[in-house]
Amino acid sequence: MTCILLDRFYSHFKFLMFSVLSISDSDKHFTSALAEYQKRLWKHLKIEDLKPIKDDNHQLVIQKETKNLIEMLWKKYANWQKILLIKEGKSFSTLEISEVLNAKDTVFVIWGPYGVDDKALLEAFPDMKKWSFGAITLPHGLAKLTLIEQLYRCTTLWTGKKYHY
């Protein structure tokens, strides 16, 4: 099955795009590693960092940030596969991720520090998938780095490059 997948993805890979939407103040501890993977995926990766909304009312922050995400997803990514990274999501192996991406442009959402109204997101985008890196809590920069490394790993699987063992 892997050979069939490689053949199928390799021919489509030159057109495949990934976008990562992240609500976060800073990834300063991960800048170097993020830059390295951005360089490796430069034709295929767009990262958009959205500034978190500052307010003591966390429910209001969640509501506003979710509204902003929905607007951006409709405006820029209406026809893309959408994946929300959230602890209640489903975990996948790298090989499963490479199959799920299925040669379709994909946007990933890393929500803000207080969470996201996933019910509102799923109402706006019923086909949105929910993925998880497990039940642990990660800093946004590390979650973004982990995601981008996995995307790079998938591309090496599709192109036959030696990276994933």
Where would I find each of the regions flagged by the language model?
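Structured adenosyl-cofactor binding patch, chiefly the S-adenosyl-L-methionine
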Residues: 120-165
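Conserved nucleotide-binding/hydrolysis micro-motifs of P-loop NTPases
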Residues: 26-27, 114-116
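N-terminal beta1-alpha1 ligand-phosphate binding loop
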Residues: 16-41
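S-adenosyl-L-methionine/SAH cofactor-binding core of RNA-modifying enzymes
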Residues: 45-46, 51-107, 113-115
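Short, aromatic/basic amphipathic alpha-helical patches
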Residues: 32-41, 97, 119-125
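A structural boundary signal for the start of the first folded domain, especially the loop/turn
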Residues: 11, 26, 38-55
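N-terminal amphipathic/basic-hydrophobic helices that include classical n-h-c signal peptides
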Residues: 1-16
